[in-house]
Amino acid sequence: RGLGDVYKRQTNGSGEITVQNLLKGKYRFVEIGYAENKESGYIINNNVAYEFEINDQGKLVTPDGATPNSDFVINNDNTMTVYNHKPDLEKDVTKRNDGKGTDEGNDTDYAVDDTVEYTLTIYVPENVAKLKTFKVVDTMNKNQLKHNINSVTISGKNADGQDVTFAANTDYTLTDTSDSNNSEITIDFKAGTSQDNLNAAAGKTITITYTATLQPGADTTTDGNVNEAHLDYSRKTDIKHGEDDTPYEIHDKAVVYTFKTGILKKGQDGNTEKLLNGVTFDLYKKYDAKTDKLKEGTTDTVIFGIKECKFLTATEAKALGLNATEAENEPKWFKVTTLTTAGEGVNAGCATVNGLPDGEYKLVETMTNKGYNLLSGPVDANLTVDYATSWTVNDKFSSDGKLIKRDVKTTTFKNGQDDYTYAPITIINRKGFDLPTTGGFGTLLFSGIGVLLVVAGVGVLLSLKKKNRA
């Protein structure tokens, strides 16, 4: 058989090739690619010849004058070790420090308009200098999350092991590649004017941090707001100019949950109920020092999404029935928003607030329909939701060269021992005696004095009549 046929070999399940009965002389292995459906994400070194020689004693040795190459080593036991490299990508979302979710850093909960911080950790392969493509793409549904492109920072280590910050346009380019459906950024390390910092990071990690803003259209169900990043890199090291470079892709995901609360407002007059529109409530949140962020330089103002919310004073909280003590002003409460019931037909009497983080909330009714009594105290609207995300974990590349490291398998919401699903809080107002509002307190006071005067007048009249009869 021809020489090419005899020595064309494929690695076994252990990554080994065995060639026997070689005669004295010089030989070389050249990688040409993967067998069909055997893609593993390792970069093919097909511009490297693994040269070796069989000497007079039948030993495997390095040929005289061979160029040193760190991609392979000739061992003393007649074997050769060849090194192939591949990068890695890990995506994490910064938690709100509430102890909720899984431990891996892939899920958390936030409020609409909150700034959500993400971290991408990239392992840089040792042969990155030989690659044509090395870039990161991060994609989000723009109705749920939107990148803050100016927040991107990239750091790593230089050749001396010192911390270094990568410079935009020099060490990488940053491009907004969003479309009508998605918010997307692309970080291309091969498009910068210098590769020095990238090459110095070979065999080490670089860290990318950036933020996104949770949008009003964020999903409030167990589907959550999933977003992903993928690292694209060349499959081989000898991509020529103009040659097609279909890269490998490593994908990783993270999810942000958010919740909602709502009201179904009913009016009751005897045995008759109807849905009430135009009823107003204020929603208050109990301050949680672990998860609610104070405005920098203040002790009484919370940053809630894009809002600045001041704590109620002890007197204000007590007047609303929020159980604050004047001495300590604990717990602290702040107003989140105002809800007004609206809707038509069967949807009348409804009001909802989307995009709330986990926490303790109360509703305080501030206005109701004419003829109905205001509630005498606040209504619990707590979102004490424990969520758990189960991930499908994978380490196999598909036949088209993609690795989906993590995908959401199932998500559960729990309220104590019970499954949690959203349901509006049904609140009932009852018909009551409705004094005219014109004149306010003065009218009520005058009415009371008038009654006393009439009664007193009757008493005087009766007294006078008795005296006359006498």
Name what the model sees in each region.
Residues 1-470:
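Solvent-exposed loop/turn and edge beta-strand elements of beta-rich ligand-binding domains
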